[in-house]
Amino acid sequence: MPESSIVVRPEPGGAPSNRLQAAGLAHATGVFAQLAATVPLPAAPRPIVVADYGAATGYNSLLPIGAAIAAFRRRTRTDHAVLVVHTDLPDNDFTALFTTLADDPDSYARKDTASFPSAIGRSFYSQILPSQSVNLGWTSWSTMWLRRPAGELPEFADHVHVEHSDDDTARRVYTRQAAQDWHDFVAFRGRELSPGGKLLVLTAAVDAAGRSGYGPLLDAIVAVLDEQVRDGALTRDEVARMSIPVLGRSEKELRAPFAPAGRFESLTIERLEVFDAEDRFWDRYLLDGDAVALGTHWAAFVSAAVFPTLASALAGGTDDPRAADFVRHLEAGVAARLASNPQQVQIPLALIVLAKQR
C-alpha cells in the first residue's frame, strides 16, 4: 500500500497561499517551524538532517521544510549544510520528486544553497536511516495508509471503507493492523531520531464520537459503484473487493504505544491535537455558491488519492483495460452527486509531536 503523502497540488499560479490550503498544512507548518527553532543542532561541519517520511512528489512538504530551514538559518551560519532525506516506497515517482525540488518556486533547494536533497526508496515500517541521525522529521497524510494492501485484508461487501461496514471481523482486523503499523512506525523513528530530535506527524484521526469523517465523499463513491454494477460496467464481486485501506486513529490509539509509562523507544509525546481541519472547497462554495465547482474539486481530490486503489480490485487489476474508464466515470459520478447535494466535509486530523529524550 502507499506510504506517500496524499498530494494536494497547488492551483494554477502555484502561490504559497494556495498550497497552504491543504487541510491542516498551514497549522502544521507553523508548529514545524517552532520545532526547528528549538531542536538541538549538530555543530558544523556535521549536517543538520531533516527527514521527510512518505514524500510522494514533495508537494506537501516543500513549505514545511522550507520554514524549518529558515528557522535553522536564524541559529546557524548560512553555509551550515542541511541534508534533507525524502523517503517513500521504491515504486514512488522519484523523478517527479526531484523535478519538484528543482523547478518549483517554493522549493527549499532553490532558496537555500546549503540545502542538499536526497531520497531513500524503502518502507518506513523498518529502520531506513542510521540510528540517532535525524534532527527533525516530518510526515503528513502518510501514516494513515495501512501497510498491507486491501487484497490481503478481509473483504467486506457493504462499503468501501471499513469504518462504515457492519462486518465486525473486518473491522477488528483493520483496527489491529492500524495499531501494529503505528507501533512500528513510531518504534523505528525512535531509533533514527538523534537525542533531543523531534518528529511531527499529521495524519487522519477520528473525532470524539469515533467518526472518521468524509461522509459525503464515501456515500457518493458507494452510490456510483452501485450504479455501475446495475449498468453492467462492474461485477458485484469486483465492488466487494474494493476498499480504501486508510484508517483514522483516536487519541487513545495514538497514545497506545507509549502506555503505561508515557515513553516508547526513548520517545515521548510532546504535543497531540485532534481537530477538524478546514474544508477549503466548502469555504469557497459559501462565497461563490458554485456547487459544480465544489463537486468537481472534491471528486478530483479523491480520484487522485484513492481511485487507483479501487481500480486495482478490477478483474484485471491495474492492467484491466477498463481501468482508465472506471476512474473517469467514477470521478464524474462523484462530482455530479456532490454538486446535486452540497455538504461540508468533515476532515478529522491529528497533529502529533514526538520528542527523543536527550
Show the residue positions of the predicted features.
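N-terminal charged/capping segments associated with class I S-adenosyl-L-methionine
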Residues: 1-132, 145-165, 206-207, 324-353
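Soluble or luminal CAZymes and related metallo-dependent hydrolases
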Residues: 27, 177-181, 246-250
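Short, conserved SAM-binding segment of the class I
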Residues: 132, 181-188, 192, 257
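Mobile active-site "lid"/loop adjacent to the S-adenosyl-L-methionine
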Residues: 139-184, 203-240
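Helix-to-beta-strand junctions that scaffold the AdoMet/dcAdoMet cofactor pocket
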Residues: 151, 193-195
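Substrate-binding/catalytic lobe of Class I Rossmann-like enzymes that use SAM or dcSAM, i.e.
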Residues: 195-319
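C-terminal target-recognition/interaction regions appended to catalytic cores
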Residues: 289-358
